[in-house]
Amino acid sequence: MCLFQGGHRFVKIFVAVIAVVAIEIGMLGGVEARSAKDAKPAHGGTILFVPQDDRPTSYEQSAAAAQKLGYTVLMPPKTMLGGLEAGEPDALWQWAEARVGEADAAVVSTDSLIYGGLVASRKHELSEEELAERVDRIARLKQLNPKMKVYAFGSLMRTPASGPASGGEEPDYYMTYGAQIFRRSGLLDKKDASGLSYGEQQELVSLTDAVPSEVWNDWMGRREKNFVANEQLIDFARKGTLDVFVLGKDDNAPLSATHMESRKLAEAAADVRPAHFQMLAGIDEFSMLLLARAVNDLSHTVPFVNVQYNWGVGGAMVPDYSDETIADSIKSDLLIAGAVAVPDAAKADLVLLVNTPPDGHMGCGNWADNDGTDRYDAASFAQFAQGFVDAGSRVAIADITRTNGSDNALMNALRDRALLFRLYGYAGWNTATNSVGFALGQGMLNVRLPDADVDRLLLDRYLDDWGYQSNVRTQVTEQLSWLKDTNTYLNLGRYEAATQLRVTRLLRQFAAQNLPPMPGVDHLDFYFPWHRMFIGGIVVPEK
């Protein structure tokens, strides 16, 4: 700590020296250490971007900040990408190989290129031979453009805790046997790591009988295929065929098949330098982090980031859907994005404030207690944020007291303090790791943008994370529950058009009540990308 108390100029020089040393030992990806505040957008740089699926967060929202900085982001048509069903990997490969020569960098989803998308990676029927051919094809991207850096990201197959928790994104049998599969895989993980008690051994026998062998063999067979593919991708990172490979533990748990596979892959990758391979909880945020990394490398920039937590458990919290502390996830996120953590907020290009629940137990955006009632922890965190903003820091907030939506009490406090559009980044969607990675990645790019562009990017998050996920979605889902159809949340079917109109109207009302007047908001449109309530798409006319 004392090393950073000697003054602004000394600290910048000292941290820059540390960053250069880190580059030399392989902690950062070969970029010059320079503050993001001094960086100039490299207009004309081109990034080839293959998203993991066609969701707005995966596609246009991940690319938006880089585009506003003046980079050309080449993206395939959405029709080639997967959603709930597999995309068109053959067409995607033709597109990528035709455009790769134009790119200075490539950020690519291995799940899209190998399986046809994130969800398809969990449900595919591809043979080992087909998978091997597609994995080898990824190596050829570098051969087609040797000067281009390739930043790749993929996933370990997730292990949802139950059928309902899977959201219908697993094979159909998971709805019936999901809870038993999850528990059985957790016991096998524990058996492999430390052994089972007598009671656990008996439970494992019972679960083995409870899950039909054809179901278990299908699920495990697919996992084994994907495991082999990930081993090969890690080897590409080892050899430099991939400049960076990030592997996500999607919807993970401390005892699960995902956790056991990650432990074995970590052992296999022990000799790969951290600058080239990272494995951590999450997946949906990786495109944002790696696009930020590509921009940082192309502009020869190493952003300095100070991380602060709400009072209480703070960085020691292990979020829902994760098997590691949020502090460890953020440490990895910084490395992935090519940033350096600094202990003094006054010396940072970006201050990342993480709104953790004081007791470490997350709620959910659609729970009844997320009613906006003032809470001490939310009010004090808003005051905490105001102190940094008023001191001149450029602040991004990762709102992770809840999964799948913003903390209404915090958002009301930020609104009442007129802080919403004094920030440089915000995220409060899906899992904690998704929100942290997105707020960090977009925040470190937003600090280089004009205020009007930052406001437009913040608007997307406030309308989606706060407006839709924590308020309108909850209200409309309750109304849909009055219908006789019980599965409308996961499949809107004949109710989609009417529901879309209802959500659009309520979102416009929400914006009018909670956000300052902004161009186009009163004419925003809403749609359901996957024809289900969980995921929304919001379009605000530019003019």
Regions found by a protein language model. Give the residues of each.
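Charged, low-complexity surface segments at secondary-structure and domain boundaries
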Residues: 1-3, 21, 218
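Acidic/proline-rich low-complexity IDRs
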Residues: 2, 26-27
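Boundary at the C-terminal end of the N-terminal hydrophobic targeting segment
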Residues: 31-35
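An N-terminal assembly and electron-transfer interface module characteristic of large anaerobic redox
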Residues: 38-543
